UniProtKB/Swiss-Prot annotation:
May contribute to the transparency and refractive index of the lens. GO terms for molecular function: protein homodimerization activity; structural constituent of eye lens. It comes from Columba livia (Rock dove). This is Alpha-crystallin B chain. Keywords: Eye lens protein. It comes from the Eukaryota. The keyword ATP-binding does not apply. Signal peptide: none annotated. The keyword NAD does not apply.
Amino acid sequence: LIRRPLLSWLAPSRIFDQIFGEHLQESELLPASPSFSPFLMRSPILRMPSWL
């Protein structure tokens, strides 16, 4: 399993761990990368529209 993808400079490795099948809590993702949080939050109030 690749632990450090080529795009690791775009996001924390923890986000890639989730993509590769390791389940993470949202509370672990959001503080790790504030700039990505609007795209990762799954709250119905803050969810990005499906067409974006």
